[in-house]
Regions:
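Active-site pocket-lining/capping segments in soluble small-molecule metabolic enzymes
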Residues: 1-44, 53, 58-181
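Active-site catalytic motif of lipid deacylating hydrolases and related acyltransferases
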Residues: 48
Length: 181
């Protein structure tokens, strides 16, 4: 198992690089403004790669206002190294990267791979439903082989980020078998 540390305070990078961590992540699933200091991010990405760590850049759900900045950031960082992994949480960004034929590893993020199971009130929402409906609502939108195969073939996804709740664990196992991660 690999250990990832997601950071937002770049000033502490030297300290983080000393730790026994495999992956250093930059960005945030929920805040599209968290990674737009491009010159600083380029600097910390290069330093992280030089330290022998895997770099994972996390993009959020992207509004129209931030779309251009997000894809420009990915393109610029992709020029630094093809080893940088990008966690994508927006279908529009995923489609754009596919059309641009970006060679970096693309990982489906939590915002694209979510389920009702993650919400605290999910039991209350589905308590009157049949078991079949409950299972459908609780299962991730990446919870079947055909969806995983489609994204693997069309978008060349290299993996996904999953919750560790019961249904999330099932989807994680299925993806591991189909994607090999």
């Amino acid at each position: 198992m690999k250990l990832e540390l997601r950071i937002s305070n770049y000033d502490l990078l030297d300290e983080y690089l000393k730790r026994d961590i495999d992956i250093i992540g930059f960005g945030d699933e929920y805040c599209e403004w968290a990674i737009f200091n491009v010159p600083k991010l380029k600097e910390v990405v290069k330093k992280t790669l030089e330290a022998g760590k895997t770099v994972r850049v996390v993009t959020s759900f992207t509004t129209k206002e931030c779309f251009e900045n997000t894809v420009r950031l990915i393109e610029e960082l992709g020029l630094i190294s093809k080893e940088i992994e990008f966690v994508v949480n927006d279908y529009g960004v995923l489609q754009y990267l596919h059309k641009k034929e970006i060679d970096n590893k693309i990982i489906i993020g939590q915002m694209l791979n979510h389920s009702l199971e993650e919400y605290l009130w999910s039991d209350e929402i589905i308590k009157q439903e049949s078991e079949k409906v409950k299972n459908s609502w609780l299962y991730s939108n990446f919870g079947n082989e055909s969806v995983i195969e489609y994204f693997k073939e069309k978008y060349h996804i290299a993996g996904g980020i999953f919750n560790l709740l019961p249904f999330g664990k099932k989807v994680q196992k299925l993806c591991r078998e189909l994607i090999g991660k």
